[in-house]
Amino acid sequence: NVSSEAAIVYNASKKEVVFEKNAHIKKLTASICKVVTALTALENLNKSNYLIISDEMVNVEGSRIYLEVGDIISIETLIYGLLLRSGNDAAKALALAYNNNEADFVYKMNELVKKYNLKNTIFNNPSGLDEDTKNYSTCYDLAILTSVALKNETFSKIFKTKKYSCTLPN
């Protein structure tokens, strides 16, 4: 008996749905969209590169990793902050690290979704914060995207991490 409105159990190795309840109903993604943000960053940015944090990157709502203007931080460390702390500032920084343009990064997120022929998912921003129902997906699409992400060695390593700390070079 599942009390949630929508749910899925997906066997990624067999590419098989074991259980589903309303798995194709569109819902707001909220922070689960950060799985796609992380995968998009890993596919389009060099995780070893460093980024200087700008004012635009720190002015975000919601959960944060508390970046400060002038911080110098690696792409990989930002992905840790994105996935472990659900850092909206990390999401914004990663998006702006791609062509210095959040819209270009979000376009890449949506291209990633299309690559797997998932027609019920669309992103409008990299954080999942959404007041206008523009970031949506389904349990099914998110199960597929998460199984794809877990095949990425760096994503899988970060996703399994229980505790992470870093020292910034500045």
Residue ranges and their predicted role:
Residues 1-153:
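Active-site-adjacent loops and short helices of periplasmic peptidoglycan-processing enzymes
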